[in-house]
Amino acid sequence: MFCLLISEEGRAQTFECGLISSVAQAGVRFRFMSGRNDSELRLCADLYHVIDGKNSCPGGLASYFIRFNAAEWKINDEVRVQFNAGPGASAGYVMDNSDRRGVVAGMSGMASFDFRFNSGLSVSAGFSAILGCHTGKKNGNTTLTFYHNGIYRAWIPEISINYRF
């Protein structure tokens, strides 16, 4: 990310930074906008069973998406609404269902509505899913299983507040 910010092409891009929050995860979001397609990097704490008190420590998850601007509407001179969707990849160290913590890796996808204001502020509401594998320990052995939470928790909405530089 540092190389992208200091390169000539990186400086020509619009950069957006913000906070993302949901019942499933909370973290930071970095978005690089160039033309019609954007890229997004998320670094989040996975909050599975943290909010309900069953787990005291969150997991960590990093996701990268290519965002395609599918539609855009102008509400007035100050506000635009964009619909974005796209594929990506995710990796981290999280819990899956009632299993212990383990490494997760997989393909991911996202869709969101972005409310963009001329002041540089934007508010996004969307969803993301992960189709991947999870490693865990069962009876002292390491197992590789389908990552259930990536699909089960895809319906949980995510809200983010961002500032454009």
Predicted region positions:
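Gram-negative (and chloroplast) outer-membrane scaffold detector with strong preference
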Residues: 31-121, 161-163
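Acidic-residue sensor for enzyme active/binding pockets
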Residues: 16, 40, 158
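Solvent-exposed loop and beta-edge segments used for protein-protein assembly and interaction
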Residues: 22, 35, 79, 151-153
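Predominantly the C-terminal beta-signal and adjacent terminal strand-loop region
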Residues: 118-165
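Short N-terminal segments immediately surrounding and downstream of signal-peptide cleavage
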Residues: 14-28
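Sec/Tat signal peptide C-region and signal peptidase I cleavage site
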Residues: 6-12
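Bacterial N-terminal signal peptides
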Residues: 1-4
